[in-house]
């Protein structure tokens, strides 16, 4: 290995690991870079931003956290509603075997609902929704021995608890003590948050001693377990959210509690959010917590330049330039910077393609698609700063990890599930990918995969179709080759090619390194059936055959438009293991392979071919309009997540004693006087311009009472 490559890899790995200091890659001046402005300098953002509950709370990570802090510290009466929403989220991503008990717990604590606890085995009783029936099938399918044993243990414990509860309810009825209920939160030794604890009767009929409960139950909002405490068996009266729910909603929940359906609390959630979007949100808008939100938004809107980042080794190259690793100086977070050379873009007339890719990346916020964090320009290039994927691409892992090419079925199934989720997220936004292949599916540090390189993606208006012969030879669908109109069907054909290649170790219509003309590959795609070896089981073969159908009408995933991914996810190929789709989307399932954190899954620096200099192209004033549209700086959700993940939010988001405003949050604060010193002739340190108070228009000191401020996104 060349010395240049060794040095480049060493520096890059050190940056990835957070450096050798306690700042974890942050600049020594990071606090100065992220210093809050005085509130008077950013309160005018109220006129420019979407100040609605649906945006500030539902979509903005920092807004959501500040609203939580406001409710917890200033208006505890509202915190019960936040806790209810948190518990419903935990409920929705739980396995069916635990969900029924958690549902009963939520019903008792927040809705004052009691229902006889019953086991459901997929038949009889309450009608189960499609997803719940699917999970029951998964739970009864061929899981590994450990999972099966855990499930059996859980079911046995469930049966015992069910009998205990029913007997308890009968005895309570006979003794006419309706307010004394049996708490079954820890039916298998775990509470709703997964913290281990045990519940034992202390002899008092009206209370049970519970240990290890999360802070949310105490009104604290944290997730760590606390010490032991005594809780009324019927739950806390001050946890009830009945005042914002009508009797019909509560009755619907009562009737469905034993079904374990994922959405039984959905309408209650909407009602609670509608309440929070009213008076609670208006109170929040008048508080220092909302002013702190405006300060964060001011920082988020600051110009982004090349000085924002440190640049490291080249990782690869694209059509318009190279991709290199970079690190944000203020936070230490690593990204991949895709540099698009201005002259090369202009020479190839790729302005429209570049802008579409940028706009699509900015629109998508998915854990299965690389996210855009920043978009900025330099003198010579347009730069997209994206999620860095340190684990390499699937093509590398299929062919270059030693042994026989391809993956075992379980690993292929896991990657296929995550890619299917990514395609579904794109399709829901009306975006067709058009370039699904192993090179474009990247692994992160933890072994999860994401879709990358959206250069060929295009947005399709509702009910319309597009035409375009674009893609990669051997992965293009027959309708693309024939230049016919299509919607989302090409993505599911390419997905079938990807799944086939992961299992077989070669593409379905072209052998690895086979020298064959493009026309011959296109003919095979349109006419030849693919061949299946013993590596495929019946479910895998069936799925590939349905995905690789020549006719759109017969192809899996192509019958329900933007929601075609649901048909793909419902295929038996994904039923032969305990795959919980919501836990997958929440990143709670363990990947089958974790990349080596000390390895660089990229070509040597000297092996990455460099671009030649573009000649005969000049950049002039006519190009500035395009560059202005591109250069939009930080992407809101990605930037806020970065602040929280790197703990910048925790370290900077401090208030005064007893939750009082700090000087930068005091509306009528006077300028800080100069400190007197021993040397009057010394050079005075100027107060940073951003921290100096300025006059505030009166209308900005009142809350917004527009309709948008109470809009809740369902």
UniProtKB/Swiss-Prot annotation:
Biased composition (Basic and acidic residues): 176-190, 199-220
Organism: Drosophila melanogaster (Fruit fly)
Localization annotation: Membrane
UniProt tissue specificity: Expressed in all larval tissues and in adult ovaries. Larval CNS staining is localized to axons projecting to the optic lobes and the mushroom bodies, in the longitudinal connectives, and in cell bodies and nerves of the ring gland corpus allatum. Adult CNS staining is detectable only in cell bodies and processes associated with the ellipsoid body of the central complex and portions of the mushroom bodies. In the wing disk, expression is confined to a stripe that parallels the anterior/posterior boundary of the wing blade and the hinge region, and weak expression in the prospective notum.
Active site: 435 (proton acceptor)
Main location: membrane
Known function: Specifically phosphorylates the activated forms of G protein-coupled receptors. Required during oogenesis and embryogenesis; component of a signaling pathway that functions during egg chamber maturation.
Biased composition (Low complexity): 154-175, 698-714
Region listing for Disordered, in residue ranges: 141-229, 667-714
Gene Ontology cellular-component annotations: cytoplasm; cytoplasmic side of plasma membrane; plasma membrane
N-terminal: annotated segments: 1-308
Record: residues binding ATP: 315-323, 338
Keywords on record: ATP-binding, Developmental protein, Differentiation, Kinase, Membrane, Nucleotide-binding, Oogenesis, Phosphoprotein, Repeat, Serine/threonine-protein kinase, Transferase
Catalytic activity: [G-protein-coupled receptor] + ATP = [G-protein-coupled receptor]-phosphate + ADP + H(+)
Family per similarity comment: Belongs to the protein kinase superfamily. AGC Ser/Thr protein kinase family. GPRK subfamily.
InterPro entries referenced in this protein's UniProt entry, alphabetically: AGC-kinase_C, GPCR_kinase, Kinase-like_dom_sf, Prot_kinase_dom, Protein_kinase_ATP_BS, RGS, RGS_sf, RGS_subdomain_2
Protein name: G protein-coupled receptor kinase 2
Record bears the keyword Kinase: yes
